[in-house]
A protein has these predicted regions:
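N-terminal Rossmann-like NAD(P) cofactor-binding subdomain of oxidoreductases
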Residues: 1-191, 227, 260, 291-292, ...
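Charged docking surfaces used in two-component/phosphorelay signaling
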Residues: 67, 157-339
């Protein structure tokens, strides 16, 4: 089996290489692609040197079984036909195709079977905040239909990329040395010692694109009429996103029921003993595969409400790991010929 990573030099591309090696993903050859800036770079994968090729409109994907694409929406749209024309399965981390009717939007713990229906040869990876939330919501949905969700997200600097993370570190340095953050480029305001209640551009309804992704993607993934209202906030941590989630169900459910289903849910680690200061924090979820969940409690404002807190590594489960799990599911179902 032959796999490719498009955008190999980026944060998600690098994480993909680590995860493919960690999980002993069954490939004979890994091919790396990138822009003119990264072409020629060399990375090691399972003891072998892999040189990044320039991504071009040619036949380079002819013998590739699966391509993990993490190079931005523009590149995904531009190269989708080139990547898929010979039957390569394209697992795309951008937002380019997520809401297309003929492209499945997949979180394996929730709707893995959707990946088998892909008329264009493309499977979309959801937004990182959506992925982490629906992994936790799906077991609760089995207890009672979820009608409404309110979310406040606390999203780390690395969610905006490696350059954004470096900018945050530079701001802290400047503040310590001069008392003023002079480097403000990736964010609309100083992020160091601050929070910014805007991620992505504003839409006509005064929600951001990030917030609308959570509304639309959750419904598509869960095949549900659930209504989601989000406020997405950039915080000055480096890695892992967190979410405060309020859930209203059709029928009453208890905190004990929720804890029980989440304790055994795939992809979830339950950390919920706040009297002993045990609850999820982004610092400990960084570099981990699971979504951590805790602070589960009965909502005081509605009879059928549950409130909880979750955190997870947005580069791993929020992007790279989810993509690899999709490919693993296709292998399990016999979609690839393993040599």
């Amino acid at each position: 089996m032959k796999a490719a990573i498009v955008g190999a030099s980026g944060a998600v591309g690098q994480e993909l290489m680590r995860i493919l090696a960690e999980r002993n993903f069954p490939i004979d050859e890994l091919v790396l692609f990138g822009s003119s800036r990264s072409a020629g770079s060399v990375y090691e994968f399972k003891g072998k040197k892999c040189e990044v090729r320039l991504l071009q409109h040619n036949d380079d994907f002819k013998d590739i079984d699966v391509a993990f694409v993490s190079a931005g929406g523009g590149t995904s749209k531009d190269f989708a036909e080139t990547i898929t024309k010979y039957g390569t399965v394209m697992i795309d981390n951008s937002s380019a195709f997520r809401m297309d009717d003929d492209v499945p939007l997949v979180v394996p713990e929730v709707n893995a079977e959707d990946a088998l229906k892909r008329p264009r040869g493309i499977i979309a990876n959801p937004n990182c905040t959506t992925i982490m939330m629906v992994v936790v919501l799906q077991p609760i949905e089995k207890l009672s239909h979820i009608k409404k969700i309110h979310i406040s997200s606390y999203q780390s600097a690395s969610g905006a990329g490696a350059v954004a993370m470096a900018e945050l570190q530079q701001q802290y340095k400047e503040l310590i040395e001069t008392g003023e953050a002079k480097t403000i480029s990736k964010f609309p305001h100083q992020l160091a010692y601050n929070v910014i209640p805007q991620i992505d551009l504003m839409t006509d309804n005064d929600y951001t694109k990030e917030e609308m992704k959570m509304f639309n993607e959750t419904r598509k993934i869960m095949h549900s009429d659930v209504r989601t209202s989000a406020t997405c906030v950039r915080v000055s941590s480096l890695r892992s996103h967190s979410e405060s989630v309020w859930i209203e169900t059709a029928d009453p459910i208890t905190v004990e029921q929720v804890r029980k289903v989440l304790a055994t849910a795939p992809g979830v680690t339950l950390k919920d003993d706040p009297q002993k200061y045990i609850y999820p924090m982004p610092l400990e979820s960084a570099g981990k595969d699971d979504v951590y969940v805790g602070r589960i409690r009965k909502d005081l404002a509605t009879d059928n409400g549950i409130t909880l807190w979750l955190t997870g590594d947005q580069i791993r489960k929020g992007a790279a790991l989810n993509a690899v799990q999709i490919a693993e599911y296709l292998i399990e179902k016999g979609d690839f010929k393993i040599v």
